[in-house]
Amino acid sequence: HRMSILQAIVLGVVQGLTEFLPVSSSGHLVLANYFLGWGESLPLYVDIATNTGTLLAVLIFLWRDVASAITGFFRGLVSAEARREPGWRLALLVLVGSVPTALIGLGMRGVFERLNAPLPVAVALAVTGFVLWFAPRSGPKHAVGSVTFLDALVAGVVQGLAVVPGVSRSGSTIAALLARGVDKELAPKLSFLLYLVVSFGVALLGVDEVRAADIEAGPLVAMTVASFAVGYAALRLVFALLRRGRFRAFAPYLWAVSAFTLAYLALVG
């Protein structure tokens, strides 16, 4: 599968824009690939390369929270006093949330690969639209200490189910946290920290895949850089929209993409 630099950049931009905006990156990658005539299914290394770019974007955007969670975790292992600090709590919430994601993600991998086609994606995008439309604007829990482990578990289960292409991972986890009463500033932070763990796992699992794919370095680097740059800008936009209570703004867009895809598939038959 030879990939041009332009194709790599387009896929990187699509991933960067859609990973953090609540519109489903996996769904958009499937549709971009289909409508641009690059074949129905995407090679897995595309997911891995673009995912590495967005992983770096979150690391840099949320570096204070990442540093707080990592140092808090290691300090908490040796000191009872450190276990009363927000960093320790944040690390535990992210770890608790990551367990169901990993179990569901690995368990459903076969199912997920079968749903990697335009029709199931169109249906899932419409569902994501409803999730965003009915999500609360904010909740009372604005300190890490007020978020419960059950909140983290719920977000982790939702994140695991979001491996279905067309279901937005960021959209559904942020909506789940808002529904559990988490505040509009903290919900996206927790969502993106949960994403970091999963994304890191995907990157590790995918090293062999990239080696085996026999793809030139140029497209791989172009894809990663494009998804990083666009992803960073998209993160800023998501936080701004949530602050203004405009999260549902993406629902009509999702319904439109879904309707267009379904109509197109019906015509092409």
Language-model features: locations:
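Multi-pass membrane proteins that catalyze or facilitate reactions on polyprenyl-/lipid-phosphate substrates
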Residues: 1-269
